Design a protein with these regions (language model features):
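STAS-like cytosolic regulatory interaction modules
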Residues: 1-56, 68-121
Length: 121
């Protein structure tokens, strides 16, 4: 089975930046996720939510990319939340202790947001 191309769309919400992840989060997602983080950071919010609702697969390299983004965000004074995770990936985030460093939401965030050009695809 071929991996599904990863894209990340950045949205500017009232109190946060949202990165909506689509496709497979693996080593090929590096540039897109990095570009999305840069675009989200440029919005100036202190909180970023990673929405994984449309993310089909996350491998160990994808977890490492999330760790790097989380480290970068913390160094920049931003908090990161995860939303839209399947029960399986919630468990992975707990096992890998990512859940110790980011809030895990039960559902993807809703509410008004405008999309910015930061998909990095």
């Amino acid at each position: 089975m071929e991996p599904t191309e990863f894209t990340a769309t950045v949205e500017d919400a009232t109190d946060e930046a949202r990165i909506r992840c689509t496709g497979d989060l693996n080593g090929r997602a590096d540039a897109a996720l990095e570009a999305a983080y840069a675009a989200a950071s440029a919005l100036g919010h202190t909180r970023i939510t990673l929405d994984f609702e449309r993310c089909g697969y996350i491998n160990s390299t994808g977890i490492a990319l999330i760790v790097r983004l989380l480290t970068e965000a913390r160094a920049d004074g931003r908090s990161v939340r995860a939303a839209g995770l399947t029960p399986h990936y919630k468990q992975i985030f707990e096992i890998t202790r990512l859940a110790d460093y980011m809030e895990i939401l039960d559902a993807a965030p809703t509410g008004a947001a405008s999309t910015t050009d930061g998909d990095g695809a």
